[in-house]
Amino acid sequence: MDDSDYLRLLTIAAEQANAFLSNARKWERERWVCQRLLQGLNIPYRADEFAPAGEPPDVLFRDANFEVFFVLDEGRRLNDEWRDELQRRRSAFSLSQLVRREAKPKRILANEFLLRLAQTLRKKAHNYTERGMDLGELDIIAFASLKREVLDL
């Protein structure tokens, strides 16, 4: 495989990431998060055990009513960076044009992260309560994808 073949594969991967992060594939993305959680907990599952639900919950699985939300670095939006990365890869003529240095992530304490998460959960709880939803019926999953910060455990 030469550089141009690899560059083409990188571009295809960015196209796939953009498609996966699109609104059209929201449920598929939320189901993927649930599957990653179940794998991490070593809980076996079959694809046919997942079903879309009304909003909320996002995903039904057995007796669980999963409500999924994403936790990103401040200022990051779910698909923006992949949209930009796709343009970067499409306009590159060589792999060397794709090389860039990333800033070293800042270490944050778990308590700091949990406080941030709690603030988001309070807002969500308020919104769900206003809509007449029973919070005890939801199984919340927070999927954290941090680039600028890393947990100091």
Where are these regions (language model features)?
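Metal-dependent nuclease catalytic core centered on acidic motifs
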Residues: M1-P52, F69-L153
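Beta-rich nucleic-acid/ligand-interaction surfaces
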Residues: P52-L60
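Conserved catalytic cores of phosphodiester-cleaving nucleases, focusing on short active-site segments
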Residues: V59, A64-F70
